[in-house]
Design a protein with these regions (language model features):
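Conserved N-terminal segment of class I S-adenosyl-L-methionine
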Residues: 1-115, 124-130, 146, 151-162, ...
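Residues lining the SAM
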Residues: 115-118, 138
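Histidine-centered active-site/metal-ligand motif
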Residues: 120, 166-169
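Short glycine-rich, flexible loops that bind phosphorylated cofactors or substrates
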Residues: 120-121, 144
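Conserved beta-strand signature within the Rossmann-like core of class I S-adenosyl-L-methionine
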Residues: 133-144
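Conserved acetyl-CoA-binding loop of GNAT-fold acetyltransferases
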Residues: 184
């Protein structure tokens, strides 16, 4: 493993010493310049969610909404309660309310979406407080463990490592294990976003998408008894 990184009991790789970056207008300008792609991603992600659940959620919270393309797609589709939470109060589409971090964790949500977000949040313990029926996530796909002896060399040059910005790195097993420890069951994992996001000549997998659900408390109690 590279210097300044460690692996936890779930297999998640964490940067140890961090110099925080600023998530400001200049940072957001990169994504605004990719507006055509981000709009497509917003609708692609919503279609993925609706295809799994077979229903329109009653409430959606997007943590780290950025340019707001996903939460706007949810609002247009007919989600009654749409909310966004971000480190900076970026503009939100009409009809979408802003909630701060405490409000986000205090609320109860049909769906919480975190696309390209989990890897940025310093303290992942908030997952234990998240009250969501469903959870949709996209993170960079870390192949360090998969590549074995070649993992360090790959990790050192991986364009998505982004020290001080991407603080945690996940593969399929570690993402599932982390969320299971916080009460979320994996429904499906895939790499569908690579169809839009891979650069010319680049080979995947590059983005790992996961959909999770939190079982009803009665179901959890029955499973624990079994």
């Amino acid at each position: 493993m590279l210097d300044n990184y460690e692996i936890d009991r779930f297999g998640v790789i964490h940067q140890i010493d961090v110099t925080p970056i600023k998530y400001d207008k200049q940072y957001m300008s990169y994504y605004e310049d990719l507006s055509d792609r981000t709009i497509k991603l917003g609708y692609q992600r919503l279609g993925w969610v609706l295809g799994i659940t077979g229903e329109i959620p009653r409430s959606v919270l997007e943590i780290g909404y950025g340019t707001g393309t996903f939460i706007e797609a949810a609002k247009i589709t007919g989600v009654a309660d749409c909310a966004g939470c971000d480190i900076t109060r970026f503009p939100l589409p009409k009809g979408v309310r802003f909630v701060d971090w405490d409000e986000a964790l205090a609320g109860m949500w049909d769906l919480v979406a975190m696309f390209d977000v989990l890897e940025h949040i310093p303290d992942l313990s908030f997952l234990a407080r998240l009250q969501a029926r469903h959870l949709a996530i996209a993170v960079p796909y870390c192949r360090w463990r998969e590549l074995g002896a070649d993992g360090d060399a790959w990790f050192e040059t991986w364009r998505m490592r982004l020290p001080n910005e991407h603080l945690h790195h996940f593969d399929r097993e570690s993402l599932v294990a982390l969320l299971a420890d916080n009460g979320f069951e994996c429904v499906t994992l895939n790499g569908f976003e690579d169809g839009i996001r891979l650069r010319p000549g680049e080979a995947g997998p590059n983005i790992l998408s996961g959909f999770f659900r939190k079982p009803h408390p009665k179901i959890r109690r029955l499973r624990n008894k079994a």
